[in-house]
Amino acid sequence: DTGYARVPLVCQSCIYDLGFGSASVRPDAAMGYEACEDAKANHPRSGNTGAGCGATVGKLCGMERASKSGLGIYAVRLGRLEMAAVVVVNALGDIFDPESGKKIAGLRSEDGSGFADTREELYKLSKRTDMFTGNTTIGAVITNGKFSKAEMNKIASMTRNAYARCINPVGTLADGDTIYAASVGDVEADINVAGTLAAQVMERAIANAIHAL
C-alpha cells in the first residue's frame, strides 16, 4: 500500500507516478499492445508520452511545487559506433540543460513565478526529514558496440555521469535512480569512447525529456 493505491511488486523498474493525476487510471494489456503498434509505425517521441506521462521533478516541497517532466530519447553515430539513450526523468532535484547550464525544470518558487533552488532548500533542513521518496530516474543506453557483460556494466556506470551533470541534487536517499546498458551489435570499439559517448547521449536525452513537453 503506497498511500495512493496498492501496487504489485512484480516489475524490474518503474517510476512512482500515482501521486500525479488519478491513481485509479491503470494501463492494461490492450493499451500495451497499442503502444507497441504505435512505436513501430512512428518515430520515437520524447516528452509527455509513454512512461513519461506521469513523470515530475523538483518534489522536495511536495507535488504542488513540482514541475512536469517526461520521456527523453537521443541517439548519435560516431564512425560505425552507434549509441542511443532513453530515460524517464522523475527526480527529486532540478534539471539543467547540459549545453547551456540553464535550469529547465524543477522546484517552483512559492508564488509560482519561477524556479526555486532545490539544493538551497535542502540545506535549510536542520534535522532528519521524511522526504517524498517516489523519485526514480530510469534510463537505458543501447549500442551496436561489441562488449562483454562486465564492460557493459562499466559503460552503465560511466553513463551515470549524465545524471550528475543534468540533475541537482541527485542520488539522494529519496531517489531510486537506475541505468541499464545493452549491446545489440558486433562493432569493435574502445570502452572508454563508448562510455563517454553514452554519458553525452544520456545528457541530451534528459534535456529532451523537458524540451519536448
Feature annotation, model-predicted:
Residues D1-L213:
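A structural signal for small-residue-enriched, beta-sheet-centric alpha/beta enzyme cores
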